[in-house]
């Protein structure tokens, strides 16, 4: 009987451990949503499909219901469901989910956005800038930034990025972010007349660029902080950066949020969680580090509500909640490590094939990346022959060093910009630092071939 008591106690401890694990497994909003979906009550509120039952009344509707499954429709709910809180009030489990995401992503405040980072960018601009105020704007900005300036009445003062021989848009050079350079471009801006206060109130920079160029965010803040108090990084394609040390200091929410002082810039970041994290289409985050000229929650939320729907899609919010949970703790590093290692393997194989064909007097495609790197001992070595683990963990392998031919951005400040290893651009022959070659293969031909074989490229230009 003593053994039975002991076994029963151990079994109870195991059961308690399982219950604790399951209780802590799910993040706050999704946990509440999953729980509510199991409550089989009549629905007297929107949406009108009432948990999917309306679709059962017609053959086409039944096919739609069967395709997506019952849980989707049971979780498509209304703001009337008080148990889940409100996206507009940031209350209940939805509010708890935003606080959880802020902790995971290193922000003071985080907001769920259910209609993309285009809306996130507009929310920030409408909260920060008004008619005839000057905004410093990366010329390589998304159309939503231009739309936001139109809506707010802001006056853009563009900061011009570099461009290389491939046509790839590079970083804004650091000298263009200096206070003297900003003053000069403002003085030359015909939209800023004498009756307008020329002091910039907001700055927006795209980080990373579409081709994977990442700024040193500390350096950008150091430079632009001489001219403006609010910094806005459009990180639509870059929501994973906080979770791998290879990107250290190269994203808006770098470091410990507790170290961000009231005398530092107020920093905003927009991230499309649906692009390169595990969230549904249209899912986005706004992250905020509070500093100088902070926009408090009540004012910011007026802009948020102006852009948001009173009928948000709850599965989209839940997917944001889940992506935060997936990136929390050790999960984020494990997931990003896997992506980086796969990208490095692909890049090295492409470089090897390119070199092998060149030895035979033939051509092959390549990747836009360094031709050589320095190994752990400081020895220069061909990229294709470098230690893959070293490439996957050492940021210096990806930094744009001054006057290196491969990147084509000239005498750029060392350490200012880095190529993201997971953003792979395949290059086709036909152009180089010295101009057009004797023979070329337009990238559109390769893109058409890949598409015909079920591989859809994200972007195609002339030779990338």
Residue spans for each PLM region:
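Short acidic/polar alpha-helix capping motifs at helix-coil junctions
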Residues: 60-66, 109-112, 185
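General small-molecule cofactor/ligand-binding pocket signal
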Residues: 111, 157-159, 458
